[in-house]
Amino acid sequence: MFTSDLIIIGSGPGGYRAADYAARCGLSVTIIESKHAGGTCLNTGCIPTKALAHDAKLHQRSWTEAINRKNEVVSQLIKGVETLLSQKQITFVHGQAKFKDAHTVVVNEALYTARNIIIATGSQPAIPPIKGAQSDTVITSDQLLSLTELPRSLCIIGAGVIGMEFASILNRFKCKVTVIESLKECLNTIDNDIAKRVRKQMERRGIEFYLSCNVKRITGNSIFFEDKKGAEQCVNAEKILIATGRRPNLSGLDLEKTDIDFTPKGIVVNENMQTTKPHIFAIGDCNGRQLLAHAATFQGFRAVNTIVGKADKINQNIMPAAVFTEPETACVGLTLQAAEEQGINAQEVKGFYRTNGRALAIEADEGMVKLVINENDLIIGCHAYGTHAADIVQEVTCLMNLSATRSQLSDIVHIHPTVSEVLQDLAR
């Protein structure tokens, strides 16, 4: 039996960053991975999609060339993670972990035990119960990233983050893209006005949207759906991408042997990422809280801090997010509507890229920024659409963590010319 201070199951951003941090805190760590180091983010998520989005924007590589470059980027970063996990206090084990009891896991018939365990197994594409969804023409986001030949046409079921990013990417590679969404608007988790602007811009590029529509069945290359009037419609495509969400990777772990609470939506945890067994933690997608790589990372930091008895000031309620369409959109905090629904007296101020010198100079004048301010002048939300939107929102994330006010933002000198001046201007 191999004993260490901490076992981590999963080596995505949550797992490998937690392993590195725990080692630096003096703990001996065993990290177990059933597939490839880096998890979904590095292998089939954040990084490969951003590599493809970059090539899509430049129009300099074919799809096949872009896929090859994506693979090179992923391989390089995997080596970096493997190097990080090769340090003295970390033992990397490749294989499927199964719990024997609340302190012990079995991997390749060997036993590993630890005082504390962090589950960081991530998630996988969720396939809805649509008749014909197992057809050869139907693919997941994981499979799309392995296609060496660009399909002539693609129908995407789902207009969330994954669906919209792939719609934007494949459209730039001259693939005919159709998106079917059951809700009234795309990107239902962000500001509705900005979501509408994203969709309208993509429609101008030739992407076709069917909103408030429910897919009923898939037959070969045909997708049959019911439109908002109740009439049956049909769309044909060479490939069909299911992008209707993700579900936690919990099968095969034998979690029942730990007596921790979990549901199909994820493992139940408290604010310190502890399960109902306080020495077992769950971070990232597998707890179903926030399906974001950076959320997993900071949940991992919180878990390790709890283990070593260190207090931190990580505010998990201020969690920025971005959608890397072209142009991108990003957000943090509350929308005005959400603030009002919570009984918060708030106002919204807007700034537009079309008045920004840098945006005009680089031909990126389509965009806007919204700040949500409460009655005490505190910034409680920011929602941006346009080039460098994620960077703008990151600035506001810093301000919100410092409980900054709109008037304080107005006094911060911003570099000229930058798109970030939109923030400074709307604060005045």
Question: What feature does the model see in each segment?
Answer:
Residues 2-4, 41-111, 189-213, 220-221, ...:
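N-terminal Rossmann-like dinucleotide/flavin-binding domain of flavoprotein oxidoreductases
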Residues 2-4, 108-116, 230-239, 276:
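Core beta-strand elements of the Rossmann-like FAD/NAD(P) dinucleotide-binding domain
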Residues 4-6, 11-76, 169-189, 315-317, ...:
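Beta1-alpha1 glycine-rich phosphate/pyrophosphate-binding loop at the start
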Residues 46, 121-176, 180, 208-209, ...:
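Glycine-rich dinucleotide-binding loop and its adjacent helix/turn
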